């Protein structure tokens, strides 16, 4: 193993395994963004709250552009297991059904760090009023 490979292996062992799942909203029907927000608030948030092996999940969206789930897992094995099972059924997932298409990206990543700001984390099923 080269010194670069050794450094990379050592470095990634101390970081958190993540996964990004992204759908395009460019051709999604009108009302899709609201339907996604309602689904997250009414179903998906509860499904992932307290999920074993998951550190946290965020749902992000740019109206008319994309919707994504960002997951951070406790171990790479848990990330790999979730990625494998999700990928196998991605086309039938709730997000795909609401949007009308499969994800355009299912990508593992490494979360280097997370900083909690002075206002603290505000975990919520919805940030809309």
Role assignments for model-derived ranges:
Residues 1-66, 77-84, 101-129:
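Short S/T/G/P-rich N-terminal loop/turn motif that feeds into the first structured element of a domain
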């Amino acid at each position: 193993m080269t010194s670069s490979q050794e450094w990379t292996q050592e470095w990634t062992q101390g970081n958190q395994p993540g996964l990004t799942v992204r759908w395009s909203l460019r051709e999604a029907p009108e009302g899709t963004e609201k339907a996604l927000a309602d689904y997250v608030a009414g179903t998906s948030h509860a499904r992932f709250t307290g999920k074993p092996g998951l550190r946290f999940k965020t749902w992000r969206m740019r109206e008319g552009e994309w919707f994504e789930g960002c997951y951070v897992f406790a171990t790479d094995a848990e990330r790999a297991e979730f990625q494998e099972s999700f990928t196998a059924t991605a086309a039938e997932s709730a997000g795909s059904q609401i949007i009308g298409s499969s994800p355009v990206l299912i990508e593992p990543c490494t979360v280097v760090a997370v900083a909690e700001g002075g206002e603290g984390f505000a975990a919520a099923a919805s940030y809309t009023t």
